[in-house]
Amino acid sequence: MSSSSKDSSFQVETPVQNILETSTNSELQDQVSSPYEPDYNSPVKQAAASISALQTQDDTLFNNVDERTLENKDGNKSDDANFDQVSGIPSGSLEIPILNSATSNIRLTPSDTYNNIPVSDTNNEEISKNIYGAPILESTSSDFQSKDSLSTTQPSVSGGNGSTSQSPPSLDVEQNKPFSISNEPVEQETENSSTKDLQVYDFQTASEHLPEQSLQNTTYYDPSKTYSSVNFEEIEYGKSHEKLDLPYRTTDFIPYSKDLSTSPEAHRTSIYSYSANLPNYYNEHNELHEHHNPQTPSSPESAYSPENLQLNHEAQNVEYLGNNAAEKSLQMNLEDEQRFQQFLKDEESIMSNWYPGQFPSASRLFLGHLNTKSLSKRNLWKVFKIYGPLAQIVLKANYGFVQFFTNEDCARALNAEQGNFVRGQKLHLEISKIQKKYQNQIENMKKGSHVTKSNQYSEMIGNLPYPTSSRKRTRSPLMSKGKSYDRKGSISMSKNFSPDCEILVTEDCPKEFVWGVEKVFQERRLNIHTTCLYRDSNLQVIIKSCIINSVKSIILINAGLAHLGKVSVQVFKDGSSDSEVRCDEYAAVDVMVAASIVHHAKTSLMHSAASSTPSYNGERIVPDVPSPCISTNPNLPALVGSLDSVNLHHLLGFIQNTYSTTSYIPTRVSFNPNDTGGSFGTITSQSQFVVNEMPKNYARDNYEALHSQESRQRSSVAGNKQLQKILEQLAELKQPDF
């Protein structure tokens, strides 16, 4: 079919009118009045679809259809258009744009006209009305593209050379129904007439969204390309997963499916982000931990979600620093580590010599509700060491103890640390109560009742009674007349006073035991002086001061030895040179044995040779030569004279061997008087006095021998002269006659 001239343009209404005329009025009425059950194969509907497609091209609703010229496949305008003789649809490629059926109405631009009235002067609400009351599609003028710019994936109606064109494809998977197009009967077009009340709508409530519908703004047409140029910067995120290459599939815009067997897919917003929900902790360098993602800060809701509970727990297993400023001080430097190791040594020594009532009653701090798996003794030492010296730290399953030396230090730590956090644990502090089994002993000691203690120490010392006046003494027995004691360790003595024995007592030693030791030494007629050792005392300086002041021996008593009823003894003797002092020590011996050792050292010096080298302060110290055996039998010369030469020879050899045998092997310690530090071992108020320690059972095994020697030394000088005569006679008979 062709037109006669170029001026008489092609009129689309001619085939449509022919089709309408061939239809009966009842058939047309049935099709128009039944919008929900249309006849999709009706030529009327197909022709109306073609008219709608032609009128919506180039974003314009045409006023005069007969002035519209069509483009063929080659892009040339022609007055003649080829129509399919059956359907009446023009041949050639014709693509129908797919509109969004989920939105509202068609919107016209101000350049469009509606019923010969500019759209700008027309109320859009009038245009959006539908005579059938069905939902109307919404789109902008930019949604209607030219046929070259339409996507090749859209359904098309093609025809040519007499072939039947394909009907519009189905967009509803279930019903397989195309879009329904309704229109009133088309009247004869005039120059000023236009299509009237043309409405396009979709009866389906759900349909797929195509990727082009995710664009908010106009897609740009590029004639050099066969696809639409998409501005990805203006894409609304989340509208279509087909446009965005997401690593997962979302169900935001998946069509509703009635298939109950289909498993639900994960929603994008429900997928858990672990990197965004990690706790935001900082290390000691104020840097983020490695597991934290700074681009996705954690939210308070996700940080405490049940799904993330285990993750948060694992993240907190690293070294916890927390937000509390006090917890950052748990980091220990080299000096702190050295002091902590010294504390462990002192703690072991204190606990080995512990006895009830050693510390004040309110000096022990109780720590409750502790998780000892994440808390160490080092952490508690770092926290509580600033309040005073610590004696002991104990950690049990769910609680612990911190032992101070004074009540004041303990109270200060309680007030300062109550409720604070250590490695994420809140401190619940209380003053520890004394156990009932120790209360009676401590109360008796506080009241001044020495009945129990005196009986106990009397058995240890040797059943020696305490002086009755000891209970009435008001002055401490630890300080005596004759010299003054400085807390730093120096001892100043008068020139006329040089004690035989210096007793060094720690401040935690029971006074009852000290009084008993003093009594034993006084009964042996030994000059003694008692000095108290404080925690800040320098023992090496004290020992050096004793040696310079010609003190012959030192007795050490601490709490541990007092609990066992023992003392430690050191005896000083001159060495081979002036810079050398020989020191014999007897560790942990009985009090009676210690008194005998000191007395023996004193008498040895008294009977030493007068030609010995002067030692200190111009005083001569004679060598330690055992005193000879003294016999009181006046008939000894006659008995010796009656012996033959052989027996006399054996007797003389026996006497010489007896005199040359010593009761112990002395040890020598190099000592320089100008050395302020000294060369002797050091002790504290809790440690034992150890300098070249001798066997502990040595003094006990030789106590009887020492006692017998002391008895023989009390003989008169006349016996010594008689012995000298006997020795002279034996010397003459040394060579036997054969």
From Swiss-Prot:
The lineage of its organism: Eukaryota, Fungi, Dikarya, Ascomycota, Taphrinomycotina. Residues 1-34, 140-169, 177-197 have a biased composition (Polar residues). It comes from Schizosaccharomyces pombe (strain 972 / ATCC 24843) (Fission yeast). It comes from the Eukaryota. The keyword RNA-binding applies. Disulfide bonds: none annotated. GO terms for molecular function: poly(A) binding. Keywords: RNA-binding. One of its GO terms (cellular component) is nucleus. This is Uncharacterized RNA-binding protein C3H8.09c. InterPro entries: Nab3_RRM, Nucleotide-bd_a/b_plait_sf, RBD_domain_sf, RRM_dom, RRM_HNRPC/RALY_subfam. PANTHER family: HETEROGENEOUS NUCLEAR RIBONUCLEOPROTEIN, RRM DOMAIN-CONTAINING PROTEIN. SUPFAM superfamilies: RNA-binding domain, RBD (SSF54928). Residues 1-51, 140-197, 466-487 are annotated as: Disordered. Residues 363-434 form the RRM domain. CDD domains: RRM_Nab3p. Coiled coil: none annotated.
